A protein has these predicted regions:
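Generic low-complexity segments that are intrinsically disordered, proline-rich and/or Lys/Arg-biased
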Residues: 3-5, 24, 77, 89, ...
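Polybasic, proline/glycine-rich intrinsically disordered low-complexity segments
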Residues: 44, 79-167
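Generic signature of intrinsically disordered, low-complexity, basic-rich segments
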Residues: 11, 27-28, 40, 47-52, ...
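Compositionally biased, intrinsically disordered low-complexity segments
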Residues: 6, 12, 34, 60, ...
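Charge-rich, low-complexity N-terminal segments
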Residues: 2-56
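Amphipathic, interaction-prone secondary-structure segments
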Residues: 34-87
Length: 167
């Protein structure tokens, strides 16, 4: 049964929920117990009190957390002069920026242009890895990802296009 609610994440309340668990189609199917078992939700959204940006964390198909900052289509970070291989440059976040484009968290009606990252890199432990008996690497808990999203939101808020910095 899906859960929905609020979680206190220090300065804000995060709206949380779970995806509908269709047998054979949920990241947790057959997954061994681990640190992720103490995080019974699949996504969370909040408005960052410091920047005013809508932020989100959500699990991918491997059960790893991904983090996103919704900066709005007009934000200068989306300008073509600020991209390298389609991703914003000069942002320091876990594993680097791996998402830049339209994103949605449909269960809570959050959507728009977002910058994001994932925690499924070499050295990261994904819950689905346990199905194949791989239990190495470091699992990045939701609390870690929330901290990275907050840092990313501040970097996006402070972002200035290169031409403004040089000219």
């Amino acid at each position: 049964m899906p859960i929905h609610g609020k979680l206190n994440i220090e300065r804000e309340l995060m709206t949380i929920g779970t995806y509908v668990k269709e047998p054979g189609h949920h990241w947790s199917d057959g997954v061994a117990r681990g640190e992720w078992s103490h995080e019974p939700f699949d996504y969370g959204t909040w408005v960052d009190i410091e920047t005013g940006y809508t932020c989100a964390i959500k699990r991918n198909s491997s059960g790893s957390w991904c983090g996103y900052v919704f900066a709005g289509a007009e934000h200068p970070i989306h300008g073509s002069g600020n991209l390298e291989h389609g991703e914003p440059v000069w942002l320091d976040v876990h594993g680097g920026v791996t998402w830049h484009g339209e994103m949605q968290v449909p269960d809570v009606n959050v959507s728009g242009m977002a910058v994001g990252f994932d925690c499924a890199h070499h050295g990261d432990m994904s819950p689905r890895d346990s199905v194949a008996g791989r239990m190495y690497g470091e699992y990045r808990r939701a609390s870690y990802v929330i901290g990275e999203v907050r840092s990313l939101a501040k970097q996006v808020a402070d972002f200035r296009p290169v031409q403004q910095l040089v000219g």
